[in-house]
Amino acid sequence: MFEDNNQKRPLYIPYAGPALLETPLLNKGCAFTSEERSSFNLEGLLPQNIETIEEQAERAYRQFMAFGNDLDKHIYLRNIQDTNETLFYRLLHNHLTEMLPVIYTPTVGKACEEFSNIYRRARGLFISYPDKDRIDDMLQNATKQNVKVIVVTDGERILGLGDQGIGGMGIPIGKLSLYTACGGISPAYCLPVVLDVGTNNQQLLSDPFYMGWRNPRISGEEYAEFVDAFIQAVKRRWPDILLQFEDFAQNNAMPLLNRYKNELCCFNDDIQGTAAVTLGSLIAACKASGAKLSEKRVAFLGAGSAGCGIAEQIVAQMKAEGLTDAQARGRVFMVDRFGLITDKIPNQLDFQRRLSQPVGRIADWPVGDNISLLEVMEHGRPDILIGVSGQPGLFTEEVVKTMHKHCTRPIIFPLSNPTSRVEATPADLIRWTDGQALVATGSPFAPVEYKGKRYVIAQCNNSFIFPGIGLGVIASGATRVTDAMLMSASRALAECSPLVKGAEGSLLPDLADIHQVSRYIAKMVAKTAMLQGKAVQTPDEVIDQAIEANFWRPEYRRYRRTSF
């Protein structure tokens, strides 16, 4: 729990020569000192000049800027990550706002689609169904022994791009990069995993260069048993792991979370992380206008696991503000491709049924059976509109202007990723509401100029939440991720909103402040874990010390030679 993070202490290294240069966690390149070059048999293997990490980072940045498109920049950064991780994170530290969209959304989506074509070097674990009886051995093969955070995907629902098979590995790699860059979690503790259960993407199956298991996806009992075999093996190998489920399809995401959330320390970022950052943003938006969330009405376009996860967090916050469960749910309207979800619609999933509107509550609406989003705008009169549909352009001018008729300051969050899937662009939303809409998006957008005013578009990015949650779990030794811990993360994020502190501020903090935001979220998460008995009670100052002790910095340490 209270690990020494004094990076001035030397590391004792058993590797030497080319083996040391080929170890990304330890390689310093031309920053090895003369003493280290002699001690580790590196003389003659490196150019003569000894550089600082800042000199290396400046050269790397110049090379980065020479590439003409973001996918090539992504490939370049991944190459640095696979050769010198400390330099990679120093480069991100120096240019985080610029590079975050390159290492993660939206560029990571294209990298996943092209995974087999741009593959350079293995990172993480590829666990394929044909090898299901050897999962324990595979975990022993991991190059990192003291793993504390795993991000795992099966590649079936990658962003808004669907089934990418083994190419989904780009998401765990990218997410864990953010755990380190934003939350200070050492890369030595992070392990990306893809469960290769086949793919139903015919384009991939027909591609001669596809690197995954060439088979249709397994499902049902076969799938459940395979995932369980993986989970049980992880528990044997790393009993105190924090495991994040990532980009699982709707029919698997919620069942897996419900099955394992009380068995190990785990959460689903698409459901819970997205919900937490969205709720934090909404709380901040309401505070800035002097209102409570419980006074608002909320419409969703998209009623999958992510949308319903956000809705449940909103309901929980409304109840915390004094509403009954029925009152809170009556203020939430879930719309899918068939229209508003009501309690008379058959074949609903369990998590949708809890959010369906009773037909009696909308009996006075002059509408037919399939109630459109536009009709919800007209008769439900929501103040907040959230898009998690994965379908572009569905927040039409008519829908938005209808909302604006009854809502002076509409809050509109088109959250679908990547940018090509967004429900409406910020420029359109601001224009259609004459600059009155408060907008946050799932992917990054440039500021919008409208009538002489500049509107900064907040990115409702999970990177404001999950790194802090991870840091809080590791620092406190929490054994579970609970709903209350996620709620604490949301409220902590809202407290960090510049808009709450000043009318002209941004809805979410600047990425330049992400380390302090993550530290604060980590502290609130840790305190809640302790209050719930999920971590050992310690005073505030000890929590602060634990967070700092676990906050890794991209700096080279001195090396001393030792033997195996």
Curated annotation (Swiss-Prot):
The UniProt note on the cofactor reads as follows:
Divalent metal cations. Prefers magnesium or manganese.
- Enzyme Commission designation: 1.1.1.38
Coiled-coil stretches are none
Question: Which positions are annotated as binding NAD(+)?
Answer: R157, D270, N417
Cofactors required: Mg(2+); Mn(2+)
Q: Could you list this entry's UniProt keywords, alphabetically sorted.
A: Metal-binding, NAD, Oxidoreductase
PANTHER family xref list? MALIC ENZYME-RELATED (PTHR23406), NAD-DEPENDENT MALIC ENZYME, MITOCHONDRIAL (PTHR23406:SF34)
Please report the name of this protein according to its UniProt entry.
NAD-dependent malic enzyme
Which organism is this entry from? Aeromonas salmonicida (strain A449)
